[in-house]
UniProtKB/Swiss-Prot annotation:
The organism of origin for this protein: Arabidopsis thaliana
Classification via Pfam families: SQHop_cyclase_C (PF13243), SQHop_cyclase_N (PF13249)
CDD domains in UniProt: SQCY_1 (cd02892)
Taxonomic lineage of the native organism: Eukaryota, Viridiplantae, Streptophyta, Embryophyta, Tracheophyta
Keywords from the named record: Isomerase, Repeat
Family: Belongs to the terpene cyclase/mutase family.
Name of the protein in its database record: Putative pentacyclic triterpene synthase 7
PANTHER family in UniProt: TERPENE CYCLASE/MUTASE FAMILY MEMBER, TIRUCALLADIENOL SYNTHASE-RELATED
Amino acid sequence: MWKLRIGAKAGDDPHLCTTNNYLGRQIWEFDTNACSPEELFEVEKARRNFSDNRSQYKASADLLWRMQFLREKKFKQNIPRVKIEDAEKITYEEANMTLRRGIHYMAALQSDDGHWPAENSGCMFFNAPFVICLYITGHLDTIFSQEHRKEMLRYIPIIKNDDGGWGLDVESHSSMFCTVLNYICLRIMEVDPDHDRKKSACARARKWIIDRGGATYTPLFGKACLSVLGVYEWSGCKPIPPEFWLFPSYFPINGGTVWIYFRDTFMALSYLYGKKFVATPTPLILQLRQELYPQTYADIVWSQARNRCAKEDLYYPQTFVQDLFWKSVHMFSENILNRWPFKKLIRERAIRRALELIHYHDEATQYITGGGVPKVFHMLACWAEGPESGYFKKHLARVSGFIWISEDGLKIQSFGSQIWDTVLLLKVMLAADIDDEIRSMLIKGYSFLRKSQLIENPPGYYIKMFRDISKGGWGFSDKDQGWPASDCTSESLECCLIFESMPSNFIDEKMDVERLYDAVNMLLYLQSENGGKAVWERASGKKWLEWLSPIEFMEETILEHEYVECTGSAVVVLTRFMKQFPRHRTKEIETFIAKAVKYIESLQMADGSWYGNWGVCFIYATFFAVRGLVAAGKTYQSYEPIRRAVQFLLKIQNDEGGWGESFLSCPGKKYISLEGNKTNVVNTGQAMMVLIMSGQMERDPLPVHRAAKVLINSQMENGDFPQQELRGVYKMNVLLHYPTYRNIFSLWALTYYTKALRLLL
């Protein structure tokens, strides 16, 4: 039976390195002696329920670790469940009971080190690159045991679409990129390509691929994966020249101006491209060359395949200017830089520079890297340099941290959302006003936050290595990963400020004030001239450079950008900080808030909403925007943008009283309701909070009461809320799964609601 192990308890490895004793580390292990018949029955029931309801909800409820923790803590829900009838008025006691039920349920799910574990996946291009890399390096069996394979072979077939393909994520239409990758993954996992043609995942996927022209229509990322495996040719890829890393800082585009995730991925890809690395052919690789194309492999004209992309994958169309640019880069890169004397003078120097960057960034992130996609290419680059090198072995030791097991099987995560989920849950707990009931949980959560703050900048001369400051920030996953994120920093700092204001006899140990100042310095530093806040680094690149992006299935992938969600969170925390520490950088903070408010206002859409870059979508961003504006002192009565936001939400409230937004809003950049105007508890919680923040309870409380009824009646017997549609997104077109959002935003909304009802008593 699968068990989730936390932190140092997850085992040790001589090639692992850590900055904080593996705080937040999550490892799944299979223990043959760890289950009773009753526990096994419970797990199998969860798997059957997911399979039976797959047509309705595509994402797992992330139940396996939850069931494990609830068993280990002998959790029993003692607070009665509340049900509100149609004509019934909600009382404060009923709302508070629902809130407390949910809080006590989540308290039982806290890990020993203070964080809340959770899946952070959903993308269908995470699993296959790991399998391909481990197959190439000969370590597939080392990492993926028979039990791992069993779970992966549960996951990939059950997630496929009805047409036989796989989408970019578990809810999206089929794409060439993910269908090709998952087909290869199944074949490496020894699934027969032709067995039972009507039902076989491989047979149907292969038909889907061939019917649409074959694997030459895979986007660039997919082509790179196929090239290193040896089932595609590098000459059929857009160029990824390592010479890019030699560009001086005064160039309009250089290693320091690009988006950190693009940088992390492409530094490793450029090394592999510059070396023209290709795996040693195996019988399977030779078979795949025959299976992935409608014509023979020898007949493919690779130069013609370079710009191909299936219509199903083409979200960001490549213009004539882009095609001309990349054709010119290819000619210069391959016809000049790859020939004597430039190959020795420039290309080999560029490859060494790319490798230097890879090693630096690996060490700075404890070999976690920036996530599931760059991790694979970094690991493969280190193996290509030296199969027995310590660099590669350190990478291999970190692979287990990317694996997640749920009732739908095994999937690879981005790199975890431990800090993000934990800080949002702590804010909910603190807002519930039941501190005495959950004191030990709050203390553990606060301890996790304190220990997770980044207290140093990246090592060495980090500017030369294209890194920015990190001191004072908090990351998305854990301290070891080391990338500070501005929204995680804002929310974490606000949590710490709340704890700072508590009596000393309630919180055993408080944060050093200087570390609070460090966090403020980080937030002030990251603000752009336009008043907005980026996520990881300053948004310093010229926006026109996005026109040259080679990425076909996502948008805004070249540069760091400002986001309304990050900006709103920063306004909230800096407003609170200024009240608690009125003498620290007050004028700068006031200027920051004024500029941020103007930025938020400038991004409001014609319908009164804001576009969400990190969640689905307009409701998500409207919550963070209005929260920031209200913190800055703006009101419904005095500020038109808040009135327009409220009107937007009231207009789209459904007949049931809830809200539910389709993920199609993200790529379409226009609000679209869920099919059938269904309700989603996450969106309902977000919209409900906006209404309460704006004073809707004083104007007309009925829309809020209707929404509260939806949330209260949605709560399950044990205090959980139902898992519905995916609510995370990035780069406009790819969904991410945050299963804890169903608890966070439902309960957070109920904290607002109970306080509003209490004022009426």
